[in-house]
Amino acid sequence: MSRYVFTSESVTEGHPDKICDQVSDAVLDACLSEDPTSRVACEAVVNTGLCLITGEITSKAEVDFNKLVREVIKSIGYRSASDGGFDANSCAVLVALDQQSSDIAQGVNEAEDHSTDPLDQVGAGDQGIMFGFACDETPELMPLPISLAHRLARRLALVRHQQLIDYLLPDGKTQVSVSYENGVPCSIDTILISTQHKSEVDGITLEEEIQKRIAKDLWKFVVEPATEDLPLKPAKESTRFLVNPTGKFVIGGPQGDAGLTGRKIIVDTYGGYARHGGGAFSGKDPTKVDRSAAYAARFVAKALVAANLAKKVEVQLSYAIGVAKPISILVDSFGTGKVSDSELTQLVQDQFDLRPGAIIKAFDLQNLPSVRGGRFYRDTAAYGHFGRTDILLPWEDVSQKAKELSLLK
């Protein structure tokens, strides 16, 4: 019998890196809402009393970046110095943006596929490798450790926003360790929650007593509600529960650590359970295959698992800048496939159009911000881009494609 423990982490929307991801994607939403053909590569940096946005944007949209940045920071919960030391109203907002390089624009606008098909004429915005993954551990076909970590992080933010626990502050992290037997989850080994909090908790000032109180409240208001509908639940008797292991977490957010767009790419994807091509998502328009092709790879992998062609699937795609068709496609089913991996790879090549233009069209990636009232990508920037059940993501809707694939068996 093979036994092992696998661990994944998530972070809340108030984590410094996640503030930056949300700022970058809010800028992307604002540009695409007014001009769906906008080219955006927006990075953000936060530090004590400062938010900088930089990168390259070519767009007809008129965006008040200063106002937008402050609105994002305020919505996360940093409304005054007492909300964790970072204040949306008084922090400095610096803007240093250029236009997209004409060399890159040429490669995207005029792909070298020598075809009259409009979808062949949209080249990849850069070279790179992207991975997509799915497995049957959860209903949303995600690995259980990252799914649980996100559930806890979302719930942690919710109880703060709703003031069910009124001493919590925006910064926080979760980590879940799951025990496996023969590749199947069998128990929740450890849950770790680190959450920023006020220096005084309901009149309690002694560090050890504060830690005990926080642990009690988090189990009742976060852990139990976040896992109540799961067949595999944490148990007080057997699941190790760690809360703020250093003793206290008062200084947090940008006051405690600088943040940067694109530094939580494992949190954004599969929690380390599958490989990663290295490219971040936030702040990038859909012509950047780091983002759009990673979404497509997830769609492919999830469709294959949903069609019962395998229990676990990883899909690798690769692209060259200015070229529409993928350079390579590879499927690995880890020995769980109903057919060979080479047959699955051929099936993907035959049944999925993975050109950037086709991906953008199929998922409507350039129009979704305007269709959703000016906000789409920003909602993906915290709590993961895959397996979401709280927002509608087109690359997660594989029901029709899975049905089509099932008929091919």
UniProtKB/Swiss-Prot annotation:
UniProt binding sites for L-methionine: 56, 100, 257, 288
GO MF entries: ATP binding; magnesium ion binding; methionine adenosyltransferase activity
Binding-site residues, K(+): 43
GO biological process assignments: one-carbon metabolic process; S-adenosylmethionine biosynthetic process
Cofactor comment text: Binds 2 divalent ions per subunit.
Cellular location(s): Cytoplasm
Binding site for Mg(2+): 17
Region of interest (Flexible loop), residue spans: 100-110
Amino-acid positions noted as binding ATP in the UniProt annotation, renumbered to this chain: 15, 171-173, 248-249, 257, 263-264, 280, 284
Function, in words: Catalyzes the formation of S-adenosylmethionine (AdoMet) from methionine and ATP. The overall synthetic reaction is composed of two sequential steps, AdoMet formation and the subsequent tripolyphosphate hydrolysis which occurs prior to release of AdoMet from the enzyme.
Subunit structure: Homotetramer; dimer of dimers.
Protein name as catalogued: S-adenosylmethionine synthase
Taxonomic source organism: Prochlorococcus marinus (strain NATL1A)
